[in-house]
Design a protein with these regions (language model features):
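Hydrophobic positions within repeat-based interaction scaffolds
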Residues: 20-43, 56-60, 96, 219, ...
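Bacterial Sec-dependent N-terminal signal peptides
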Residues: 1-32, 39, 49, 84, ...
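Residue signature of alpha-solenoid helical repeat architecture, marking inter-repeat boundaries
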Residues: 39, 76, 116, 156, ...
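Post-signal peptide N-terminal segment of secreted/secretory-pathway proteins
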Residues: 36-117
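Solenoidal tandem-repeat scaffolds enriched in leucines and small polar residues
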Residues: 149-229, 239
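Tandem amphipathic alpha-helical repeat scaffolds
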Residues: 43-55, 80-94, 120-133, 157-173, ...
Length: 375
């Protein structure tokens, strides 16, 4: 599920997670009603937005933060308000809205100096280009972003630019170039820098090395991610619930490693560990990965009916909006039935998948040619 890789690693905890969000939000709203229109009020609005980041209230409060910050000529909170709008629309893949808020955010950041947030926002925009298969545009914009970050000596922007380059290269099947860009991002990480950025880069490395079947490096990065996560949660225990998706990711990819090294029982223990982090609020992509790893596990122990049933679950989830991933899952299901000895069923699935892939490949080839002509 290569397109899924592009989404699952981008926004790990860019806003702080909260447990008991309804209680925390209600409490802060009561405080907000008593505050004068000053910086304290802006700070409280900012905290409320962090809690409400996953629903439409985020936009309502971000609008309020923007209006009040502009009245007070507070460029810091105006920049943050623009960033929260961007994050909300990025998570919903609304490319035009992201572009609109990038334009609004940049002049505010030039005054506030919040360049880390601006480069995060640019990363959202460029990764959406990649997600919508505008690979040459993504590469061009990532290189512009890298140069701007180098010009102002912003490490986070440089790291993010290399991550964007990696996504675009991998999305267009240039795996070696993608891994090289990602390893450069990893090399540039400050030793005691932002843990969330470290987690994001490591998660990409884990996803890519797994796809490239590089078990040695995958295990190395899994162990490092586990250590970074452990230290982060020890230092920030209240944020553990907000990082549940990262724990799911880590356990699922440990399971992949152990399945790839013929250790299914250890793999199963990690799948079971991932289950305890699943909730109704778990991000869609992680739910797909969760069912997919169960399919892989049951295939490894030759329980083909159960393996196929889990693939069916992922197909239902992917069919509407993720055509190429849907085709990839059909191919996985075909391989399951080949192993099970049901060649007729496998052939039908192969034909369905290849028809989708041929259509997608032709469209992608035409799109890339047009992008190259324009560049």
């Amino acid at each position: 599920m290569k397109r899924l890789i592009l989404l699952i690693i981008t926004c790990y905890g860019l806003l702080s997670g909260y447990a008991n969000t309804d209680t925390a939000s209600d409490s802060l709203l009561q405080v907000l009603q008593t505050l004068p229109h000053d910086t304290t009020r802006l700070s409280t609005l900012n905290d409320i937005i962090k809690i409400e980041q996953n629903n439409y209230k985020c936009i309502q409060y971000s609008d309020s933060l923007m209006q009040e910050a502009l009245k007070l000529k507070n460029d810091k909170y105006a920049s943050l308000a623009a960033y929260y709008h961007l994050l909300y629309y990025y998570n919903r893949c609304e490319q035009d809205s992201v572009a609109k808020w990038i334009v609004k955010m940049e002049p505010l950041v030039q005054k506030s100096g919040l360049w880390d947030y601006f480069f995060d926002a640019r990363r959202f925009q460029i990764d959406l280009y990649t997600f919508t298969e505008q690979y040459e545009l993504a590469i061009s914009e990532a290189n512009k972003m890298k140069q701007k970050a180098l010009d102002i000596d912003n490490n986070r922007g440089t790291v993010a630019a290399y991550q964007c380059l990696s996504n675009a290269y991998i999305g267009s099947q240039r795996w070696d170039e993608g891994l090289k860009a990602l390893e450069e991002a990893y090399r540039l990480l400050p030793k005691n820098g932002n843990a969330v950025v470290h987690i994001s880069v490591l998660s990409q490395l884990i996803s890519v090395t797994k796809e490239m079947k590089d078990n040695y490096r995958q295990l190395k990065y899994l162990q490092e991610l586990e250590n970074v996560l452990r230290k982060f949660i020890i230092d920030n225990p209240s944020l553990k619930d907000g990082f549940a998706d990262v724990f799911i990711f880590n356990e699922i990819f440990y399971a992949h490693y152990y399945l790839n090294t013929n250790q299914p029982q250890i793999a199963y223990s990690h799948i079971e560990k991932s289950k305890k982090y699943l909730t109704e609020n778990t991000y869609f992509m992680y739910k797909v990965l969760y069912y997919d790893i169960y399919a892989k596990y049951y295939q490894s122990i030759k329980q083909y009916q159960q393996a196929s049933a889990y693939i069916d679950t992922t197909l239902t989830m992917l069919k509407k909006d993720f055509t190429s991933d849907y085709a990839e899952q059909l191919l996985k299901q075909a391989k399951i039935w080949v192993e099970a000895g049901d060649n007729n069923r496998a052939t039908t699935l192969y034909q369905q998948a290849l028809a989708i892939k041929d259509s997608a490949a032709m469209a992608l080839s035409n799109t890339q040619m047009e992008q190259i002509k324009k560049s």
